[in-house]
């Protein structure tokens, strides 16, 4: 498997780490949405970050949605990941490319802007739970770190990186989520923080062939233990049946307008771009069902 996430623990079992290589899934998203460089970086980092949160927190049939509601040119980013580590997402504006920063990297901070980061968890309870924090950086990894500290009170460090080639294809995509467990000493936390600061630029390292296992050893040390290795992928579960169900929630007058004026309907999935066409007869059947005919 090319795209996968690993869960690891350090030798003293007081640091938990998830690392991910997600080049292919980010490339799939880029192709589906035809995103340009800045949009790809925002979407790619959001996909990776949401998968890391899902890997750390979800089980069973649970799912988690990240909403990055910035006022930058890319607009909002919406990403949903499930406990099986499938993910889907989109940004409001696909065709955004910005002048590079002085160091040559994509200006993700400018692309995102100011606003709010929301994380909604559907844990199978009566109501989903949403945590919200202001966007403090716009680089996304720092914003997720802030969210985990403020909303969930978990000392964490997040790193995310997406390398976009000059032709807008994806060259590399990966990242990590480190969490301190109860009992972790200040000395250990400082030592680990120093290791993270000494890491090579993530996208360059992934381009050079670094694996999630390599990254885990760089952060936790060679004596860390790999607990799990799971495939991650881009997958949208949309279907014509689901969209028919959505049409059933419309007012009868709206359906009648689609039949009489548009002579059908075409619905496009935000997450994957798939198009679903409904004929006049199909819309009439939905309307009849709604009216109890």
Swiss-Prot record:
SUPFAM superfamilies: Hsp33 domain, HSP33 redox switch-like. The keyword Cytoplasm applies. InterPro entries: Heat_shock_Hsp33 (IPR000397), Heat_shock_Hsp33_C (IPR016154), Heat_shock_Hsp33_N (IPR016153). Keywords: Chaperone, Cytoplasm, Disulfide bond, Redox-active center, Stress response, Zinc. GO terms for molecular function: protein folding chaperone; unfolded protein binding. It is found in: Cytoplasm. One of its GO terms (cellular component) is cytoplasm. Pfam families: HSP33 (PF01430). Under oxidizing conditions two disulfide bonds are formed involving the reactive cysteines. Under reducing conditions zinc is bound to the reactive cysteines and the protein is inactive. Disulfide bonds join 236-238, 269-272. One of its GO terms (biological process) is protein refolding. The keyword Repeat does not apply. Belongs to the HSP33 family. HAMAP family: HslO. Redox regulated molecular chaperone. Protects both thermally unfolding and oxidatively damaged proteins from irreversible aggregation. Plays an important role in the bacterial defense system toward oxidative stress. This is 33 kDa chaperonin.
